[in-house]
Amino acid sequence: RDGYWSRGLGDVYKRQVNEGIWQVDRGIAQLSQLSPQGDEILLGWAQPGTFFGSWLTFVNSYQVKGLSNLYLKWYGIEDLSNSAELSQMAFSQLARRMRQTEALLAISGLKRVEDRLQQLLYLLQQELGESTKEGTRIKVRLTHQNLANAIATTRVTVTRLLGEFQRQGWLGFDSDRHIIITSVKFHSYSKSDANFN
């Protein structure tokens, strides 16, 4: 029952949703829901080891989008019931997802868009960052619209703020347009200002 989905495909969650859960084996997925107006609301990210599926959520308009190519494993409810090791693994990953969701809720409560974007970048640095000689590189390429949807603002505003951060030397982009957090100043500011750490 394992599966492969190419980057961007958003209907993974529709497969066998009432019988069990998916686990990311390789790749990164974005978890979201749609508002009544059709806007995307970010719920978090699923990395290798993360479990997801409609069986684990009350959200009706649950969506899963591959930020990279996804390799997934499928587990039925009976698999979880019969394996203490698998159940413990699922519990550990769900606890991590809960912390991630709490951080996103804290970000959404910040009044200034600039603060929301800074805290989102800091969370991305923690969750999806990898160390390089230039700084911390976000492992997936996020569009300005992705970031705007995550903090309830416009793409134009995100583009303007990213330009300001880049001029201030806080971040940059690699040749594939992945965000790179380049400055200790950004890390220190974000950590001291964040109310979810």
Task: Name every feature range the model reports, one short phrase each.
Residues Q23, G66, I180-I181:
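Conserved hydrophobic "DFG−1" position in protein kinase catalytic cores
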Residues E127-N197:
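Phosphate-/nucleic-acid-contacting segments
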Residues E19-S32, P48-G49:
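Glycine- and acidic-residue-biased ligand/ion/polar-headgroup-sensing regions
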Residues Q88-T153:
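Polybasic "coupling" helices that flank or enter modular domains
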Residues L42-R99, A103:
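Cyclic-nucleotide recognition modules
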Residues D2-Y13:
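Single conserved hydrophobic/aromatic residue that forms the stacking wall/gate
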Residues D11-I21, D39-E40, F58-N60, G135:
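A short beta-loop-beta micro-motif enriched in histidine and acidic residues
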Residues A29-I41:
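A short beta-strand-loop-beta hairpin characteristic of the jelly-roll/cupin
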